[in-house]
């Protein structure tokens, strides 16, 4: 695989920092540009971030002296890269405009932001689930008037535990309805315990917009391409409740599910164990070897013990049992700050690279 020059737009924030750590030794992607707000532009990355480096590993030496570019100077950034990762903290309309500006400058955008997730011709992709949605990109390029530029996005971090668990069961058994309660870590809000003292000894029973995303985005993932748009699926019906809990990293889901054709517990476990997708089949560098891991222990998975399984890119599942109101219930865990954020975007970029969309 050839090497691609990569930029990070929103490089000083928590997700931007995670992108930088993931790209430090990436075999295909070489970090050549860092962009952020005008107040950071012109400073070295080290000075722009200052004491706000939030990763557990030290800031990579290679980026410390890189001069931060102004993210709004699209042509200047685009000239230095083959594509960009975007993780900015702006209003939705501003993010939409910025990402389209990069795409129209013939610079593909792999976005961690939510702004374009429900745009009908923007593929929102989990590589193991709906890699075929990348085939909408020519239609998007036609709308944008670009030859090379496009936008592709990853889905919300709350989905990354329960959607992969449900997906392989849909073909043979037909998921009809699902109730999910998510217990979401503070890193999902860009916080640490030092910057979020209100969460200590507390649970906050509301995360703005999260329940709507958790109910609607899976239907787009399970949708199909019809002409120049992705049409969301109409089933299953999903209802969600999302809570912020005092955990540093790792989103959990408590899932209740009913099927059109109820499988046995053994059939579910076999399906999970055998499931693999294009990320595994193509041996993408960031892909977990085993995507879904099931724990037999009654008290697993746990964020503290299991969030880093397969370098934080796999999904952990446990406590599968029959239910009185639904057919089955189970719990699941994914690492929101890796699989659910920058790691998922890097995996998507690897898929795009293999499929030739950056060429």
Kindly label every feature range from the protein language model.
Residues 187-359:
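Charged docking surfaces used in two-component/phosphorelay signaling
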Residues 1-206, 236-237, 309, 315-316, ...:
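N-terminal Rossmann-like NAD(P) cofactor-binding subdomain of oxidoreductases
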């Amino acid at each position: 695989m050839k090497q691609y020059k990569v930029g990070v737009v929103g490089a000083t924030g928590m997700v931007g920092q995670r992108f930088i750590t993931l790209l430090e030794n990436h075999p295909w992607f070489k970090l050549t540009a860092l962009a952020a707000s005008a107040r950071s532009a012109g400073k070295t990355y080290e000075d722009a971030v200052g004491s706000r480096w939030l990763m557990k590993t030290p800031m990579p030496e290679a980026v410390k002296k890189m001069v931060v570019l102004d993210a709004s100077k699209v042509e200047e950034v685009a000239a230095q890269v083959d594509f960009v990762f975007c993780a900015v903290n702006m209003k939705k309309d501003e993010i939409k405009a910025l990402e389209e500006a990069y795409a129209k400058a013939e610079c593909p955008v792999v976005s961690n932001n939510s702004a374009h997730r429900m745009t009908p011709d923007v593929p929102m992709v989990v590589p193991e689930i709906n890699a075929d949605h990348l085939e909408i990109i020519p239609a998007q390029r036609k709308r944008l008037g670009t030859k090379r530029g496009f936008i592709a996005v990853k889905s919300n971090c709350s989905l990354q535990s329960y959607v992969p668990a449900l997906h392989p069961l849909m073909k043979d058994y037909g998921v009809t309805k699902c109730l999910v309660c998510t217990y979401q870590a503070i890193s999902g809000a860009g916080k640490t315990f030092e910057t979020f003292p209100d969460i200590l000894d507390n649970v906050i029973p509301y995360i703005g917009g999260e329940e709507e995303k958790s109910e609607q985005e899976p239907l787009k993932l399970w949708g199909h391409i019809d002409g120049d748009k992705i049409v969301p699926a109409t089933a299953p019906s999903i209802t969600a409740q999302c809570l912020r809990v005092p955990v540093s990293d790792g989103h959990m889901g408590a899932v209740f599910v009913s099927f059109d054709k109820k499988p046995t517990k053994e059939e579910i476990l076999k399906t999970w164990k055998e499931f693999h997708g294009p990320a595994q089949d193509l041996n993408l560098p960031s892909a977990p070897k085993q995507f879904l891991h099931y724990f037999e222990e009654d008290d697993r998975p746990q964020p503290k013990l299991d969030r880093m399984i397969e370098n934080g890119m796999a999904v952990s599942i446990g406590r599968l049992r029959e239910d009185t109101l639904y057919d089955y219930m189970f719990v699941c865990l994914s690492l929101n700050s890796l699989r659910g954020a920058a790691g998922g975007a890097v995996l998507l970029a690897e898929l795009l690279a293999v499929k030739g969309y950056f060429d």
